[in-house]
Amino acid sequence: MLCIADKTFDSHLFTGTGKFASPQLMVSAIRESGSQLVTLAMKRVDLRNHNDAILAPLLEAGVTLLPNTSGAKTAEEAIFAAHLAREALGTSWLKLEIHPDARWLMPDPIETLKAAELLVKQGFTVLPYCGADPVLCKRLEEVGCAAVMPLGAPIGSNQGLETRAMLEIIIEQATIPVVVDAGIGVPSHAAQALEMGADAVLVNTAIAVADDPVMMARAFRLAVEAGALARQSGPGSRRAQAQASSPLTGFLEAYS
């Protein structure tokens, strides 16, 4: 069970809506993933038209929508987009994304913190996409963000948990949920994130561009479930040396 602000989720897997070959395939994959929270880029849909090809099937599926401000380059642009989304969709939940460089899509830490603080004061439930910076994540928590979403690797890169060392610090010090976002390329990456203590992962590209997105969505669902169970079970500590799991000499006593 995962609690963020005023909502509770059974699934620790959040999904995106970009890059799918068709809206029908998108919905099928989301259903198979078991995801209950789905991000939606406001620049890709007609927010005022609930019959929009992408928006309509999501509303029908009954998932919680998390509109994002992807495409915003400044805090001002992100705040403007947030208010449009709240008016059109009737939700104060927001994935805050500000990345001024279209090539690398790295989140702007200064503009993100600035926008997050203002949006929280304006009544939004803010989940900021940010770099794997422990100091920044703590500052975002302090201004009232409902969760933080540090990247594992650049968006869409499928590189995995390249920022693992920093993610471990973020997870250890956080008192709000940590959702690893961006760069997760295969189910094992998602399992590793949950094993190390992340509360959830957000996956889009790895599912959408797979040869069989629906099958990949199921694989991610199972991986996230396995990672969460592994964490809850209390795995043994790592050791520098070997340690036998059974006596090495007991059976030799009769021989001697």
Swiss-Prot record:
GO terms for molecular function: thiazole synthase activity. Pathway: Cofactor biosynthesis; thiamine diphosphate biosynthesis. It catalyses: [ThiS sulfur-carrier protein]-C-terminal-Gly-aminoethanethioate + 2-iminoacetate + 1-deoxy-D-xylulose 5-phosphate = [ThiS sulfur-carrier protein]-C-terminal Gly-Gly + 2-[(2R,5Z)-2-carboxy-4-methylthiazol-5(2H)-ylidene]ethyl phosphate + 2 H2O + H(+). Coiled coil: none annotated. 1-deoxy-D-xylulose 5-phosphate binds at G156, A182, G183, N204, T205. Signal peptide: none annotated. The active site is at K95 (schiff-base intermediate with dxp). It is found in: Cytoplasm. Its EC number is 2.8.1.10. GO terms for cellular component: cytoplasm. InterPro entries: Aldolase_TIM (IPR013785), Thiazole_synthase_ThiG (IPR033983), ThiG (IPR008867). GO terms for biological process: thiamine diphosphate biosynthetic process. Disulfide bonds: none annotated. Keywords: Cytoplasm, Schiff base, Thiamine biosynthesis, Transferase. It is an enzyme of class 2 (transferase). Homotetramer. Forms heterodimers with either ThiH or ThiS. Belongs to the ThiG family. Catalyzes the rearrangement of 1-deoxy-D-xylulose 5-phosphate (DXP) to produce the thiazole phosphate moiety of thiamine. Sulfur is provided by the thiocarboxylate moiety of the carrier protein ThiS. In vitro, sulfur can be provided by H(2)S. This is Thiazole synthase. It comes from Enterobacter sp. (strain 638).
